[in-house]
Amino acid sequence: MDETPTTHFGYREVPEADKARLVGDVFSSVARRYDVMNDMMSFGSHRLWKLWFVATSGVRPGDRVLDLAGGTGDIAALLLPKVGREGSVVVGDINGDMLRVGRDRLLDRGLLQGLSWSRMDAEALPFADRSFDCVTMAFGLRNVTRKERALAEMHRVLKVGGRALVLEFSSLRVRALQPLYDLHSFHVLPRIGRLVAGDEESYRYLAESIRRHPDQATLAAMMEASGFDRVDVRNLSAGIVAIHRGYRT
């Protein structure tokens, strides 16, 4: 008898078919406090990381950009001035609650032109080959069940000469800081999650998912195996997060 394929959900092993639902439950729970969560996880640094991420994207006026796991709208809001009136940004997210929060937030800011929102699975993108000049994914890849499949899809929908960028928590490069980082991730963060959002378990999963995510070298190799060329890595904040960039040639 064939065994049911499994994957990780934080430190738990779960059936592959269940992970998307479990991750969806987490993000539906934290959707309206997602910025607060990111501030707690990064001491507010996520705002600077996102600015740097978009600054290194190479996006130009007239480009068509796909922002995956972009439901909060943070990256889209930064991309819109870069694509200009002739360009466009498609925000894709598998979680409808996240999309609603992000769409409402950007509507309140009057950001409408050149922006569209769509619920989609990063492992099966609903676009033709070579549709986008750039694909971005910030703090989303670690929650994908089959990361290699998502990377291959990102490569598929890129135009020749296009680039994909992944911003994600990664492996700390300064080992002396690891005990303090672990204390914050596994003890402080879940307790704050319980006090602020009444949801300790979701915040515990998010901390665990960071540790289970591939390190810098492993993710770079995965991108190369998915077809990307000229893959480079930039560590931010001593490797707490990293930007991976690859090109379709």
What are these regions (language model features)?
Residues 226-249:
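Core SAM-dependent methyltransferase catalytic element
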Residues 29, 33-36, 40-63, 78:
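Conserved alpha-helix/loop element of class I SAM-dependent methyltransferases that forms part
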Residues 18, 167-222, 226, 232:
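C-terminal alpha-helical "lid/dimerization" subdomain adjacent to the S-adenosyl-L-methionine
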Residues 123-134:
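A short acidic, Gly/Pro-enriched loop at the edge of an enzyme's catalytic core
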Residues 64-124:
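Class I SAM-dependent methyltransferase SAM/SAH-binding core
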Residues 148-163:
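A short glycine-rich, Lys/Arg-flanked "PGG" loop and its adjoining helix->strand segment in the class I
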Residues 1-25:
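N-terminal auxiliary segments of SAM/dcSAM-dependent transferases
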Residues 34, 135-136:
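Hydrophobic beta-strand segment of the Class I
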